[in-house]
Amino acid sequence: MVEEPRKRARPGRSPAPAGRTARPRQAEVARLAGVSQATVSLVLADKRQGPAISEETRRKVLEAARSLGYVPDPAARRLAAARNNLLGVFSFTATFPTDVQHSYYPFLVGVEREAAERGYDLVLFTGSSTGGAGAAGPDALSRVRLADGCLFLGRHAPVEELGRLVVDGFPVVHLGRRDEPAGLHWVGADYVSAAREVVGHLAGLGHRRMVLIREDDEAPASTDRERGFAEGLEAVGHGSVFRSADPERDLTPERLRRWLADGVTAFVAEETDTGAAWRALRRAAADAGIECPRDASLALLGSPPADLADGPEPTGFDIPRTRLGAAAVRMLAALVAGEEATEPLVACTFRPGATSGPPPGAEDH
């Protein structure tokens, strides 16, 4: 089950119904100009923030709009001009993560503090809300339009529904890096550099063969961690990646013993909202009788789940969740105000921990 990262296919767009005679839509302008709907929205709204758009592309969009007789919906314009000082926060969970032990809770602390500082109230949505992410169809996220803009949390936000909000010009920010949909604003942590630093620490202890355990999805946060893992090993050793949709089932004590027999001396797990990879690694190591760091070193690319915080502190890094929440609100407030919206990647903090040490036999050399 050692695999290379897989590239994601970009989703297509459904064609507009044939024979329509009503007001031309942005989708038709996009087809005629040969660009995405998000690009049309940004050009027609004369928004300069977000992805750079060349003057040639702007010219094509404006010419296509003129030739089709496109006129912006005046009702939509009036709605865009109305502000009520409400920011939405949408969590793709069944209930809102207000438990202090939930991994999202520190994000929400930063969101609440920054929103209060800027004079905004918050309206909270969850995946089980009426009209929320659990609904089907083009209006799955429609209720967030009650707010001036919305911040989204979660690894598995629906691309199509988010894309519809972006195309409509509704201010949206995703907490965590996102490649899709086009034009979506996001804030994120620098997981590449953080993962590279953790691997560099292990290499400095003498480890040359490592395995990364990650869940089998394509979340950008996982991709960034894997990239940092690979970059950290480029000049010093060899690494492989174990991907599983169910790490607690597939990462067995026998598998760990085989890796150790093959010369692997360090195991690295990614952090996710489920904590599945780290849970599986800890359990398998304990069941295999592996004592860390005497027999092998363990590292976690993130922080352990709250229910596992009583064990030895893992080598790894801490994510600045409160700072990320505040950065997301700053970006969203800028979008609502029609201003430039940029936020740098936020650096993580290396954590030496107590689960790493020199590889077995290193003291003999």
Where are these regions (language model features)?
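N-terminal helix-turn-helix DNA-binding module of bacterial transcription factors
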Residues: 1-83
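Residue-level detector of anion-binding/catalytic polar loops
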Residues: 71, 117-121, 171, 208, ...
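Residue-level recognition of beta-strand->loop/alpha-helix junctions
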Residues: 126, 176, 214, 244-245, ...
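Structural signal for hydrophobic
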Residues: 87, 172, 229, 295-296, ...
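An alpha-beta-alpha
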Residues: 196-240, 342-357
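Alpha-helical recognition/docking segments in bacterial nutrient-uptake
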Residues: 1-6, 21, 82, 86-200, ...
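Short, solvent-exposed amphipathic alpha-helices that sit
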Residues: 60, 102-117, 194-197, 220-239, ...
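Flexible loop/turn connectors
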Residues: 5, 257-365
